[in-house]
């Protein structure tokens, strides 16, 4: 048994926020209350000054297996997640081969059994990411797929998307969408505007996102499907999601830490380590994302953890791949830029990083109560630390060298300590 003493337990399900102890027995939260130390515990953790929260859940990561394991693999990705306080992640399907069939899905599922945290795998919406024919969603759901996404590529056939939504509604699974109309993207990875012009690039206009978000919100309203707008970056799109929710659509949006922290100006400082799709946008867009997080329009924070090798990111801007890593800095960026700046309460932040993403994928996790699975993160929200090295195979991050608040000290998954600072 493990006794966690003197911590500030924050649980978004019950709205509990109090100094109280937890006992973990086997893989469950056995008791919540006030307990004395004794020899019966194998481990006693003094969580004084720390928040004790549900293990974090990230619904948007790339662990690059199969096909690109020189960038990341399931083991290294899981360890990176554990260091960041995450106990469950959902991997995207843009691997090689693409996860669009049961064999590839089962390969990842089998490899994930040895991971230190819960690694779940989403499947593609269309075969081969070609946007022409739906995968066998029913068979894949039976195999254990929690949701479907062609993340990395936008889906352009509206009728096919409507078919997918009707099927997803029937199967009670979410569909997650990467929203960028390629015909409106001059150069990916940088916002169309002043910075793109300085770099001699056309950039990617926010309207490329807006038109796709508008379409998918309306299709979600029509079909009743549960739809996730991935890595929202445009302020106008935030307003559209808010309106779609008002109309009754089951639409959720996820924001990445880089989109609520940085702006297009940071591309000039960090170069390819600030290149991602969708790109960093204007200060106005960033402020609209923070507003959306604050008022509940954006329910989920997800990293879009996208590892690349140093050689790939060292190429010139236009040739370098898009994406940055995020698992090891996500919580601290939320604490530093949202909680400490009074945009969100600690309860709201934890909610957007645990129970809300779990609900999207119909997972019965993300909360602290007796009998629940013992997935726990223990972190000091006031401890300052400098981002220096990563557990991930990659280090493509614009936050290297930055001082952040919020240090993860323990991550416990299924009752086992999987990370200890």
Swiss-Prot record:
Pathway: Pyrimidine metabolism; UMP biosynthesis via de novo pathway; (S)-dihydroorotate from bicarbonate: step 3/3. This is Dihydroorotase. Binds 2 Zn(2+) ions per subunit. It catalyses: (S)-dihydroorotate + H2O = N-carbamoyl-L-aspartate + H(+). Zn(2+) 2 binds at residues 151, 178, 231. HAMAP family: PyrC_classI_B (MF_00220_B). Zn(2+) 1 binds at residues 60, 62, 151, 304. Its EC number is 3.5.2.3. The active site is at residue 304. It holds the Pfam family Amidohydro_1. GO terms for cellular component: cytoplasm. It is an enzyme of class 3 (hydrolase). One of its GO terms (biological process) is 'de novo' UMP biosynthetic process.
């Amino acid at each position: 048994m493990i006794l966690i003493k003197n911590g500030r337990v924050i649980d978004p399900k019950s709205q509990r926020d109090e100094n109280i102890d937890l006992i973990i027995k086997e893989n469950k939260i056995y008791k919540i209350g006030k307990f004395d130390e004794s020899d019966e515990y194998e481990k006693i953790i003094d969580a004084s000054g720390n928040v004790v929260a549900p293990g974090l859940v990230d619904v948007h990561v790339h662990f690059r297996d199969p096909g690109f394991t020189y960038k990341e693999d399931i083991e290294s990705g899981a360890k990176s997640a554990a260091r960041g306080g995450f106990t469950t992640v959902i991997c995207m399907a843009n691997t090689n081969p693409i996860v669009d069939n049961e064999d590839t899905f089962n390969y990842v599922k089998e490899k994930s059994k040895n991971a230190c945290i819960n690694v779940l795998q989403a499947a593609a919406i269309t075969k081969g990411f070609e946007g022409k024919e739906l995968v066998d969603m029913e068979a894949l759901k039976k195999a254990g797929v929690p949701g479907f996404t062609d993340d990395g590529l936008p889906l352009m056939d509206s009728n096919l998307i409507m078919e997918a939504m009707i099927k997803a509604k029937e199967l009670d699974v979410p569909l997650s969408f990467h929203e960028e109309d390629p015909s409106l993207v001059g150069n990916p990875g940088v916002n169309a505007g002043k910075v793109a012009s300085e770099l001699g690039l056309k950039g990617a206009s926010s309207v490329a996102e807006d038109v796709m978000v508008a379409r998918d919100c309306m299709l979600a309203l029509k079909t009743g499907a549960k739809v996730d707008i991935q890595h929202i970056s445009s302020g106008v799109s935030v307003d559209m999601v808010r309106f779609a929710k008002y109309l009754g659509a089951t639409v959720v949006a996820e924001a990445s830490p880089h989109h609520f922290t940085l702006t297009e100006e940071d591309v000039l400082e960090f170069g390819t380590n600030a290149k991602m799709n969708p790109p960093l946008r204007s200060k106005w867009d960033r402020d609209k994302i923070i507003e959306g997080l604050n008022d509940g329009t954006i329910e989920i924070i997800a990293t879009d953890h996208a590892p690349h090798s140093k050689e790939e990111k060292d190429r010139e801007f236009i040739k370098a791949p898009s994406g940055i890593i995020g698992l090891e800095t996500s919580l601290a960026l939320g604490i530093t830029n949202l909680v400490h700046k009074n945009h969100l309460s600690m309860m709201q932040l934890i909610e957007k990083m645990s129970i809300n993403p779990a609900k999207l994928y119909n997972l019965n996790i993300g909360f602290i109560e007796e009998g629940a699975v013992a997935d726990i993160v223990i972190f000091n929200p006031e401890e300052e630390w400098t981002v220096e090295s990563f557990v991930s195979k990659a280090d493509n991050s614009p936050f290297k060298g930055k001082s952040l608040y919020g240090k993860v000290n323990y991550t416990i998954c299924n009752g086992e300590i999987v990370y200890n600072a």
